[in-house]
Every structure is written in structure tokens, then in C-alpha cells.
């Protein structure tokens, strides 16, 4: 970001542009529709050759949930066919939890890569799993990836509670923007300043009241959409176009697109292999032309890649344990209580036994207690968020647990 205060401009570093151009040549090529190719041709002109445009509220107003669609019926049917795992009805977020360790790395790395982050996939894996910061990388890049990890864990861990509402999206921004904005008070808050986008002819909305009104309209519209894939793509289009936050808008839209997928136990969208230049051009097409065809080409291609990837991963994992599934809430409740109470190794067995006697069927108590003890032993900084434990609560408990 260049500048602070009333006017800030967001720009892509020259080195990142060069990297994106190389990636376009060397990496995967997304097949484009005729309309998508036309949009790309337009946005590849110099900014001076493109028509200056401002935010057009009518682009949002024209959309009527479940009456007008960005994705055709054929598109939605196809995405459902490739993205719906062959599993029995399960609680929201079950599928994402099964593949969480891979999703954390894939989505954190790819979403950060689309912002110009230079961490490698291996660097990202070591950072997320071991907490090891890559040598020679900017702290900003490390922070960006860790923020993605926190945000993904929030969405998956609170799958029953998230949705297209202010609580979810503002907190999603707070997690993704943590320690990255010049103004710390702008984290999780709608934009009060004017912003510009470097190398674009688009001028975002400036009036805070109108930003808030449009933001609430986007959320209400998204919440009313019945099809989860249409919901996902709608927020990928409309959230960045509004630029509701000082920065980090596209990151919010990419993770928000996963909200309906997580809630409906569909394959998540990790943006694996998406060329950065194509994605950037697709977003510019929405900004400057209010045309979605190129972004839709990216979305459809990226989702098919994600579906194939996670189908293979899930197959290697096998079916979920039905016992763990049945007592999912009880496991989460008890482990969270034990951690918050800072229960040590010596007292854990007795506390688990007493709790189980009150809450668990007598036939299942012994097995339930065994699993809780194993979970406590295996609890570490990379997996405690699934029990809705804060970092400070985990750290305080861990100190007691490790004491001899």
C-alpha cells in the first residue's frame, strides 16, 4: 500500500508482476471462454487506454437471489457432481475437518501466492506445521500465511455458526489483516478512507455510509442464495468490487467463498495452480467492466482442480470414525474444559472419568475416555483451534501439562 490516511493506493510490486508473467508462461493455462478472452484482451491494455470507471451500485442491485444467476444451471450441476463427496449426511464442516491439515497448507499458500507472497509450498508447510519461519523471507509474508491459517481454522472450527453476516466476515477480515495494516484500528472494520488501485482504471466507492449499506446488501443477498456454488462465486465477484476494507479484500473474498462449501460439506476451493496474472486480470474485468466471464472461467477451472485433489486425499484417509462422529460435541466440550481449567497429566484421568459418568452412555465411557486422553496427549499449537481454545488458553494449559 502506498500512502496513509484519507487516500491510499494499492499496488502490485514490480517484482511480483514479473513473477506473475513468468508463471503465466511456465504454469498451467486456464481454458478461456470467448467472453473471458475478450475481457483479458481489454484489461491487458495500459491503464491509460482503458476507460476510468467508478463503483456502480446497479451491478449489485440488478442481482436477484435465486432468480438471476452468475453460474448457469449446467455449471451448478457440474460443480455439485464433482464437489460433493459420496458420504452420508454429516454435521457442517465434517469434510473440511477430515482434510484440514492439507487444506491449511494448500489454501494458505495459494491465497498468499495470489497476493505475491514468495514463500514456497515447502516453506509454508514448515511454517504451519512446525512454526519455522523461512530464512530470507519478509516478516510480512510470514504474517500473511499465519493469518490465513488462523482464518481457515476459524471457518472450519465454527462451521455451525459462520455465515454471510457481519460477525463472520468482519472477523474473517480481522484474522487475515492482523498485524498487516498501517492503521491497527482498521482490522475488522469497514473502510473509512478512500483507496485507489494501482494500474487500474477503477475508482472504488468513497462514502463510508454507502460502503456500509452496500456491504450489508452483499451479505443479505449472499445469505439468501440457496445454491452453495452460486453463493461462493457471488462473494468472489461482489466483495472485492466493493473494496469494503482498507486492504485484504480479495483475501477475504477467497476465504468467504469457502463458507458455503464448508457448511455443506463440499470440496473446499484452494485455488491450487491458479495463475496469478489470470486471476488478477479476471478481478480487473469485474472492477472495470462489471463482466464476470473471465473470473467465472477461473472459478470453474480452480474448483475442478480442488475437487480432484481432495477426492484423492480423502480416499487415502478412509471413512471417518463413527464413534468420534457421534460424540463430536462431547469431545470438543470436555477437551476445551480441561484445557481452560489447566488440568495436568496427574489429574486428567480422574476428571475425564467423572465427566464421562455424567454425560456418556455407560457402554461407551471407557472408549470415550481413551480417545480424550489420546487427544490431550496429541494436542499441539497446530491443532488446538478445533476445540475453540484461544492461543493464551492453550499456552497456559501446556505449561501445566508439560510440568513434571
Model regions: which residues?
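FIC/Doc superfamily catalytic core
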Residues: 1-404
Amino acid at each position: 500500500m502506498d500512502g496513509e490516511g484519507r487516500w491510499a493506493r494499492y499496488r502490485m510490486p514490480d517484482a511480483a508482476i514479473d513473477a506473475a508473467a513468468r508463471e503465466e508462461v511456465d504454469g498451467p493455462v486456464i481454458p478461456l471462454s470467448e467472453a473471458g478472452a475478450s475481457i483479458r484482451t481489454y484489461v491487458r491494455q495500459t491503464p491509460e487506454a482503458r476507460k476510468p470507471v467508478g463503483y456502480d451500485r446497479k451491478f449489485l442491485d440488478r442481482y436477484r437471489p435465486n432468480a438471476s444467476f452468475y453460474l448457469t444451471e449446467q455449471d451448478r450441476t457440474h460443480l455439485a457432481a464433482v464437489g460433493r463427496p459420496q458420504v452420508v449426511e454429516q454435521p457442517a464442516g465434517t469434510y473440511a475437518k477430515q482434510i484440514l491439515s492439507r487444506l491449511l497448507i494448500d489454501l494458505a499458500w495459494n491465497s498468499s501466492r495470489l497476493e505475491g507472497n514468495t514463500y514456497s509450498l515447502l516453506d509454508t508447510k514448515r511454517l504451519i506445521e512446525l512454526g519455522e519461519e523461512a530464512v530470507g523471507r519478509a516478516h510480512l509474508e510470514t504474517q500473511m500465511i499465519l493469518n490465513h491459517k488462523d482464518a481457515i481454522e476459524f471457518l472450519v472450527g465454527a462451521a455451525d455458526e459462520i455465515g454471510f453476516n457481519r460477525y463472520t466476515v468482519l472477523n474473517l477480515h480481522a484474522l487475515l489483516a492482523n498485524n498487516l495494516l498501517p492503521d491497527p484500528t482498521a482490522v475488522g472494520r469497514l473502510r473509512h478512507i478512500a483507496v485507489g488501485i494501482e494500474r487500474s482504471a477503477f475508482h472504488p466507492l468513497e462514502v463510508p455510509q454507502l460502503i456500509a449499506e452496500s456491504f450489508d446488501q452483499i451479505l443479505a443477498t449472499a445469505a439468501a442464495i440457496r445454491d452453495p456454488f452460486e453463493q461462493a462465486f457471488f462473494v468472489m465477484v461482489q466483495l472485492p468490487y466493493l473494496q469494503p476494507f482498507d486492504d485484504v479484500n480479495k483475501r477475504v473474498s477467497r476465504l468467504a467463498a469457502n463458507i458455503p462449501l464448508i457448511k455443506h460439506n463440499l470440496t473446499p476451493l484452494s485455488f491450487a495452480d491458479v495463475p496469478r496474472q489470470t486471476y488478477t486480470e479476471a478481478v480487473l474485468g469485474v472492477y472495470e467492466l462489471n463482466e464476470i466471464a473471465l473470473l467465472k472461467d477461473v472459478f470453474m477451472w480452480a474448483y475442478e482442480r480442488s475437487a480432484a485433489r481432495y477426492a484423492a486425499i480423502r480416499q487415502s484417509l478412509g471413512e471417518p470414525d463413527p464413534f468420534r462422529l457421534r460424540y463430536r460435541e462431547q469431545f470438543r466440550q470436555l477437551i476445551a474444559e480441561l484445557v481452560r481449567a489447566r488440568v495436568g497429566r496427574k489429574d486428567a484421568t480422574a476428571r475425564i472419568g467423572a465427566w464421562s459418568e455424567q454425560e456418556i452412555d455407560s457402554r461407551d465411557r471407557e472408549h470415550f475416555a481413551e480417545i480424550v486422553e489420546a487427544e490431550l496427549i496429541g494436542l499441539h499449537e497446530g491443532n488446538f483451534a478445533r476445540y475453540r481454545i484461544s492461543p493464551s488458553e492453550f499456552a497456559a494449559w501446556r505449561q501445566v501439562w508439560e510440568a513434571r
